[in-house]
């Protein structure tokens, strides 16, 4: 087994018993693939599939004029390249997008010609607006900020059957309904009412009898009855009535007469219930006709019209109920042996629902039914024949107005039981009748209703599909405008671009990416929060559910979530269950349904074949769990295996198993799979744990978790935070900001530059103001392969996710300071900067045009102290590296103010000192309250045409210098490579002449080549023409590369020197970035990975902390009472295993210090790595690599305990024993203050602790004098408004209870909204006279005004 560059530096010991045969899929694939399918940018126009942009264009084009004289056809589209790259767009506040151009053909027909003849064809490329591009990590940059389009889980198009669970009617009767949901178009509902009539609704409007719809579709009453019912046949034979017997239909009926055969044998006596035995007897007797009394016909319903054969008169119409009178008329008019057909109905399983509905239906024929539907859809409009037909045909039969979609058709056909899964995306008459038949069948007790929360009935709409819908909506708006203008095409000699206005398209796209509910500000706190945000699935958003209306069932975990949606990770609060996360191995299929992988089982043997199944397909198979036992050959060892079948957990024999899970972690999401010992945690706490990991703030120095799950490396690499080598090669140069790699020849294609330069991200602000900083982990000369990690990012350590720090934990109470989840922490943790984090604040100063003139950025600010001015350069902008505090000036700016009338004193001063500065006011950018730190970056943006200041020019020069350095490095390596190849080519060849008087026919030696300058090597002439040609090619290639580099430099120079796009009226914008160092302090929120969270109560001196027998003080003291009731035992197991990890590291460190032999260290390592769990291949590492591995392990051997497949208690004890630690995981602790041992043994060990993004610095705040509410004159609330503390109703009660009358009066008046009183308080404090004169609170005046607004005049009596 081969290790990657970073893996071999620190191998994580895994306790996994089962290795997954399927590597982890790319975690951002859903987003990236969906958008790639939407754009199809890399696909040739002729080969593009009908999806995404292509499908949207195809749906709208061709557009024809109303007169059909002109037509606009779409040929293809082309995406340009973005002017700025991602980083430039973020800096400049632009959207990272590319221009979209469509090639369109205008065809004008000849009006005068007798048959359609083309008169003129014009073809042109038309600009269609900008389409945002996705970054490599699956996000979008919109107006300079990174955003994510969250995938939506919505109800799949198709047909659904359900009932009201007996809630509608007081009797509790189940009312069945069916709904046909299209992707686009009108919803069609069918429903039963309590009287068992069947109705339909279109778009939830007024209900109408379903037979109205059937008649509108062209069915007659007789056809409807024939389609929905089976018939009973009777023959009138003289005085006898013969019934054509089908014995099965009589089952369960009460015999109203003796059923007798022709020979007089009685099969069933009168008033007896007909049983299955009777039915069998009748079938065996082969009795086909029996004589029935006339009463048997009474109440039956006629299936067809009965016509008098002599007169042609209709004696009885179809669907009439036979009564005595009607029966007499029928007997009189019908001939001997004539047949009557009636509907076969009963109360049990063949109800007369459609027949009853037909009776209440008032429409008579097709037209009257269509008119009734028209009146329902368009009340008040006169129904003309054309309008009626157009509306009815447009509802469900027109592709423009109605689209069931490919998914909808597949789901529809599958539900109505058809073999064919494809077909028309509009409805047909057969579709509608099939749905009604199934609905009637449900009422008759046949079939089952659908579960709408089943993942086979919910599909994912990813970013590509959502963007396509918006683009299509924009194009539809364009279509209307184009249709209007096309009629003028010929007369005005217009070109295609004159018709198409790109505004509606680009505004639809801009609105979607900028302000849609599904376009969210990316959570960038740490790499995990980024990756989780992109894998999120929301049931909210346009076309989805709303928080208020979503019930318990939708939010609940469903059996089909298994392996598709994580049952653990979901927010707490109103969105619980509506926002979910994709499971680890899940992906979406072509239809948008979530699939999960399984290994196929053949003949009780597990194969290597992997099959992805959706929830629809899965239920029919028997699927075993991933922890099922099987031997080396894959044969199940147990006779009976725990498995899932039809969404139920069950036991099955091993020969019935068809599939087996791919991995134990299959059911959970990325965040949940990062929790070690997840299987020992209560689900509620695991939910909090997975959510809190996303809030972990990156620490100054990231530290890998000693106890992980083995997926840390995958998350770090897939999130894009850690830098990967694009191609293999040798590290040529490394510094803190860039890595230069000389690429292996084998990986360099012809014409490519054989050098990769990685400019690392240094101290960049994230969306959540945390710090994104990358640091190299390679050295010069390191040999790398493709995909190797070469630099760590925020919260990553040697290419592994490292969200927190490993702390030495003791579970014990300590003076009540860890009461109720409080956390006690050692001062050493703070002094060692273990949890110190850097937060970057961005502050912006804007210089605008005002009516009185332009605001000016300058250092010449009135009344500015020398100390403040010293921090500003001559342009008035703060220096990089300046330490600034609240209130300091960052950007000096003055605004012109209107000239006021001067007082005589001011005139005199003006005359003496000649001061003219008073006509401007200071509007400088100051550091806001609560922020102090170091200025780390300044960016200046200047409008085109405005002169740049000195600082701006300096920034551009520095940027160009960095770019030039990159190009120089590239050129250096390219030249070295070219000269190397030239040297190999020339050495030993026969020359025809050359520099330094090289003699003809002399052999070129190494010494000669070294004596000549390298660029003169290309002047050497050779006898061999072939070699000369190769030398010429190397020279041409080098010249070409130089030209390319010069062009790249010129392009960069042009970009930087051109003006910036700024909002209207803005002349200059200065952004200042301040790095704020946040050290750990009381009030900060900390958490483990098991939902064990708390707030720091006190930071205790090291010498007072409890310590172990060897003198090691613990870092953190947690309350043991926080464990049993929360049932998150995982944290205790983590602490035990963490202690073992640290103990083993300590032993390895001792071996290194005593300079033990590499083979001895190798033996000890193999004891750790090869005893149990996953076997590691230490043999493949040489001694040097073993020593480097041991050095990296000396701080602790990292363990991986994968979820549901982790370390057992015995394995933890074994590791503790190997580390020479007590197997109980407990030890004696001593009180740091007294030195006495505590009575009981204490659980001690290492836990990975996170600092959460709920810092006390961001929350703590005190008001001095601040803003007041306009109406009530009370202080505002909240830190953002510099507000006060609310003194509410209950607090007033408290003071009343204490009888603190004066305090209460103070609170309700001068400290709140007594405007005059609070001014007087200030005066009395200044005078030193501490007297309070309380007046009328403003809120009382507001109350008086409110009462007056109700029409009651209220006044206070004046005394």
Curated annotation (Swiss-Prot):
A GO molecular function held by the record: ribonucleoside binding
GO biological process, alphabetically ordered: DNA-templated transcription
Catalytic reaction annotation: RNA(n) + a ribonucleoside 5'-triphosphate = RNA(n+1) + diphosphate
Domain of life: Bacteria
CDD domains: RNA_pol_B_RPB2 (cd00653)
Keywords: DNA-directed RNA polymerase, Nucleotidyltransferase, Transcription, Transferase
Pfam family, one: RNA_pol_Rpb2_3
GO CC term (a single one): DNA-directed RNA polymerase complex
Known EC number: 2.7.7.6
Function noted in UniProt: DNA-dependent RNA polymerase catalyzes the transcription of DNA into RNA using the four ribonucleoside triphosphates as substrates.
Similarity-based family: Belongs to the RNA polymerase beta chain family.
Subunit structure: The RNAP catalytic core consists of 2 alpha, 1 beta, 1 beta' and 1 omega subunit. When a sigma factor is associated with the core the holoenzyme is formed, which can initiate transcription.
Protein name: DNA-directed RNA polymerase subunit beta
């Amino acid at each position: 087994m081969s290790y990657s560059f970073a893996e071999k530096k620190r191998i994580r010991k895994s306790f996994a018993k089962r290795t997954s045969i399927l590597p982890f899929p790319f975690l951002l694939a859903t987003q990236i693939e969906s958008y790639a399918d939407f754009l199809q940018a890399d696909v040739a126009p002729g080969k593009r599939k009908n999806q995404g942009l292509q499908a949207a264009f195809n749906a709208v084009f061709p557009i024809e004029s109303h007169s059909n004289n002109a037509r606009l056809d779409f040929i293809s589209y082309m995406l340009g390249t973005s002017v700025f790259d991602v980083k430039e767009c973020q800096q400049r506040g632009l959207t990272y997008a590319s221009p979209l151009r469509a090639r369109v053909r205008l065809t004008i027909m000849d009006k005068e010609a007798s048959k359609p003849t083309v008169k003129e064809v014009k073809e042109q490329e038309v600009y269609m607006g900008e389409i945002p591009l996705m970054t490599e990590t699956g996000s979008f940059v919109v107006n300079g900020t990174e955003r994510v389009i969250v995938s939506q889980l919505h109800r799949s198009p198709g047909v659904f059957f359900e009932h009201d669970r007996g809630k509608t009617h007081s009797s509790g009767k189940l009312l069945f309904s069916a709904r046909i949901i299209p992707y686009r178009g009108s919803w069609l509902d069918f429903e039963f009412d309590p009287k068992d009539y069947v109705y339909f609704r279109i778009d939830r409007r007024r209900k109408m009898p379903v037979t109205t719809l059937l008649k509108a579709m062209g069915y007659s009453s007789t056809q409807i009855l024939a389609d929905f019912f089976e018939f009973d046949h009777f023959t009138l034979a003289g005085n006898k009535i013969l019934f054509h017997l089908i014995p099965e239909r009589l089952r369960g009926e009460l015999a109203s007469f003796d059923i007798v055969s022709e020979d007089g044998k009685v099969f069933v006596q009168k008033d007896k219930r007909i049983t299955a035995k009777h039915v069998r007897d009748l079938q065996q007797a082969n009795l086909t006709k029996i004589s029935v009394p006339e009463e048997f016909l009474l109440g039956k319903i006629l299936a067809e019209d009965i016509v008098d054969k002599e007169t042609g008169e209709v004696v009885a119409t179809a669907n009439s109920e036979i009564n005595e009178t009607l029966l007499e008329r029928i007997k009189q008019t019908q001939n001997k042996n004539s047949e009557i057909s009636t509907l076969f109905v009963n109360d049990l399983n063949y109800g007369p629902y459609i027949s009853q509905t037909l009776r209440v239906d008032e429409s008579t024929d097709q037209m009257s039914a269509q008119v009734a539907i028209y009146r329902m859809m368009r009340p008040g409009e006169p129904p003309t024949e054309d309008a009626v037909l157009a509306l009815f045909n447009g509802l469900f039969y027109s592709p423009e107005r109605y689209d069931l979609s490919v998914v909808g058709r597949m789901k529809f056909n599958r539900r109505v039981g058809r073999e064919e899964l494809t077909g028309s995306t509009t409805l047909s008459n057969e579709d509608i009748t099939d749905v009604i038949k199934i609905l009637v069948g449900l009422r008759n007790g046949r079939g089952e209703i659908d579960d709408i929360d089943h993942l086979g009935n919910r599909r994912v709409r990813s970013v590509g599909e959502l963007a396509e819908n918006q683009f299509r909506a924009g194009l539809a708006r364009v279509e209307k405008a184009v249709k209007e203008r096309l009629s003028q095409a010929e007369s005005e000699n217009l070109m295609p671009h004159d018709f198409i206005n790109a505004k509606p398209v680009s505004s639809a796209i801009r609105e979607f990416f900028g302000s849609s509910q599904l376009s969210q500000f990316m959570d960038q706190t740490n790499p995990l929060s980024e990756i989780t945000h992109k894998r999120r699935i929301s049931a909210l958003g346009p076309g989805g559910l709303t928080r208020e209306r979503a019930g318990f069932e939708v939010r609940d975990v469903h059996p089909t979530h298994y392996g598709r949606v994580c049952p653990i990770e979901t927010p707490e609060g109103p969105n619980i269950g509506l926002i979910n996360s994709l499971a680890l191995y899940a992906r979406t299929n072509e239809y948008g349904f979530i699939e999960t992988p399984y290994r196929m089982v053949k003949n009780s043997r597990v194969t290597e074949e992997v099959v992805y199944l959706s929830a629809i397909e899965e239920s029919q198979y028997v699927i075993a769990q991933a922890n099922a036992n099987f031997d080396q050959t894959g044969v199940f060892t147990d006779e009976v295996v725990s498995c899932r079948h039809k969404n139920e957990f069950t036991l099955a024999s091993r020969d019935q198993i068809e599939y087996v899970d791919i991995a134990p972690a299959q059911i959970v999401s990325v965040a949940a799979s990062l929790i070690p010992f997840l299987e020992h945690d209560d689900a509620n706490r695991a939910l909090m744990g997975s959510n809190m990991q996303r809030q972990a703030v990156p620490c100054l120095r990231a530290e890998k978790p000693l106890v992980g799950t083995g997926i840390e490396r995958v998350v770090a690499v897939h999130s894009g935070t850690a830098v990967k080598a694009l191609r293999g090669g040798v590290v040529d140069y490394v510094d803190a900001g860039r890595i230069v790699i000389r690429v292996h020849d084998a990986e360099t294609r012809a014409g490519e530059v054989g050098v990769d330069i990685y400019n690392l991200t240094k101290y960049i602000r994230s969306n959540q103001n945390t710090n994104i900083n990358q640091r190299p982990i390679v050295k010069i000369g390191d040999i790398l392969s493709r995909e190797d990690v070469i630099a760590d990012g925020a919260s990553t350590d040697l290419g592994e996710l490292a969200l927190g720090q490993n702390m030495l934990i003791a579970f014990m109470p300590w003076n009540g300071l860890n009461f109720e989840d409080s956390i006690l922490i050692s001062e050493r943790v703070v002094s060692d900067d273990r949890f110190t984090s850097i937060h970057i604040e961005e502050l912006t100063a804007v210089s605008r045009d005002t009516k009185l003139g332009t605001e000016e950025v300058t250092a010449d600010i009135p009344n500015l102290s020398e100390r403040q001015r010293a921090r500003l350069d001559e342009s008035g902008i703060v220096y990089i590296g300046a330490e600034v505090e609240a209130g300091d000036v960052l950007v000096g700016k003055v605004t012109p103010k209107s000239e006021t009338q001067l007082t005589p004193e001011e005139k005199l001063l003006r005359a003496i000192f000649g001061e003219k500065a008073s006509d401007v006011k200071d509007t400088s950018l100051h550091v806001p309250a609560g922020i102090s730190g170091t200025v780390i970056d300044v960016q200046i943006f200047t409008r085109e045409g405005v002169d740049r200041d000195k600082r701006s020019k300096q920034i551009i020069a520095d940027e160009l210098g960095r770019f030039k350095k990159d190009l120089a490095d590239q050129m250096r390596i390219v030249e070295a490579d070219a000269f190397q190849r030239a040297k190999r080519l020339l050495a030993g060849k026969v020359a025809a002449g050359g520099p330094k008087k090289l003699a003809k026919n002399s052999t070129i030696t190494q010494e000669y080549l070294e004596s000549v300058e390298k660029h003169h090597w290309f002047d050497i002439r050779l006898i061999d023409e072939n070699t000369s040609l190769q030398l010429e090619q190397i020279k041409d290639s080098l010249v070409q590369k130089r030209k390319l580099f010069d062009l790249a430099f010129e392009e960069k120079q042009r970009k930087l020197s051109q003006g910036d796009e700024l909002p209207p009226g803005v002349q200059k914008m200065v952004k200042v970035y301040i790095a704020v160092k946040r050290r750990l302090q009381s009030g900060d929120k900390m958490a483990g990975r098991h939902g064990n969270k708390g707030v720091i109560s006190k930071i205790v001196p090291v010498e007072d902390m409890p310590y172990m027998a060897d003198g090691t003080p613990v870092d953190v003291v947690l309350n043991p009472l926080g464990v049993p009731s929360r049932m998150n035992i995982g944290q205790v197991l983590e602490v035990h295993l963490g202690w073992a990890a640290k103990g083993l590291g300590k032993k390895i460190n001792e071996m290194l210090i005593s300079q033990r032999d590499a083979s001895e260290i190798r033996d000890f390592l193999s004891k750790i790595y090869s005893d149990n769990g996953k076997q590691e291949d230490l043999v493949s590492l040489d001694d040097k690599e073993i020593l480097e591995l041991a050095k990296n392990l000396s701080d602790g051997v990292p363990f991986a305990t994968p979820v549901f497949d982790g370390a057992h208690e015995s394995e933890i004890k074994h590791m503790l024993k190997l580390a020479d630690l007590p197997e109980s995981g407990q030890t004696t602790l001593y009180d740091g203050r007294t030195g006495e041992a505590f009575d009981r043994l204490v659980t001690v060990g290492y836990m990975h602790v996170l600092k959460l993004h709920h810092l006390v610095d961001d929350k703590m705040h005190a008001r001095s004098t601040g803003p007041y509410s306009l109406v009530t004159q009370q202080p505002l609330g909240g830190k953002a408004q510099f507000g006060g503390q609310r003194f509410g109703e209950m607090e007033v009660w408290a003071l009343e209870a204490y009888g603190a009358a004066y305090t209460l009066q103070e609170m309700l008046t001068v400290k709140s909204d007594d405007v005059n009183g609070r001014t007087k308080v200030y005066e009395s404090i200044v005078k030193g006279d501490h007297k309070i004169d309380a007046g009328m609170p403003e809120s009382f005046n507001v109350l008086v005004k409110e009462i007056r607004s109700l029409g009651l005049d209220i006044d206070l009596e004046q005394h």
